[in-house]
């Protein structure tokens, strides 16, 4: 199975917010709100936004399958950066970087992810563009839902 071609989804997105980095960081790290903000996050067991934390996640998006994975926060620098590794049905890395802007702050999300297990693996192999659209849907809707829920 590992010999089959995989499709990696690379992402590098920037989002402008009209609040300071500190205010944005406070909102982003309210992990007890994640399931309220994002209804497609079916299960989430995170307790803290801190280096060394392991979060078990189950995502059910618009496609007819779920993704189960673990996020390990490897580096967290308050109001600056968080870097994580993902393992499970999705593998790879993700990085969140906050920067000052003329009016407020900028959140940059970079990632390199590949489906490694479950039905997502087959969808990715057979329909790379569908996997990319699903990834984009989660990111785009996630930011929109975050903005609506937090007001930032």
Residue spans of the language-model regions?
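Hydrophobic ligand-binding cavity/cleft-lining segments
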Residues: 1-50
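Glycine-rich portal/gate segments that line the openings of hydrophobic small-molecule binding cavities
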Residues: 4, 45-90, 141-152
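Intrinsic-disorder/low-complexity, polar/charged segments enriched in Ser/Thr/Lys/Arg/Asp/Glu/Gln
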Residues: 8-16, 54, 68, 81, ...
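A short, structured loop/turn motif at beta-sheet edges
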Residues: 18-22, 46-51, 74-79, 97-106
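Hydrophobic pocket/interface hotspot
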Residues: 24-28, 34, 55, 73, ...
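Beta-strand/loop substructures that line and gate deep hydrophobic ligand-binding cavities in soluble
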Residues: 85-140
């Amino acid at each position: 199975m590992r010999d089959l071609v995989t499709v990696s989804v690379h992402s590098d997105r920037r989002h402008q917010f009209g609040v300071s980095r500190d205010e944005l960081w406070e909102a982003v790290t309210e992990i007890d709100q994640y399931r309220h903000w994002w209804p497609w996050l079916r299960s989430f067991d995170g307790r803290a936004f801190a280096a060394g934390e392991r979060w078990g996640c189950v995502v059910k998006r618009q496609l007819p399958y779920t993704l189960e994975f673990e996020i390990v926060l490897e580096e967290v620098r308050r109001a600056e950066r968080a870097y994580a590794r993902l393992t499970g049905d999705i593998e790879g890395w993700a990085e969140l970087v906050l920067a000052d802007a003329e009016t407020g702050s900028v959140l940059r999300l970079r990632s390199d992810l590949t489906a490694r297990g479950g039905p997502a693996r087959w969808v990715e192999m057979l329909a790379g563009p569908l996997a990319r659209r699903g990834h984009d849907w989660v990111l785009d809707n996630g930011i929109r839902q975050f903005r609506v829920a937090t007001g930032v």
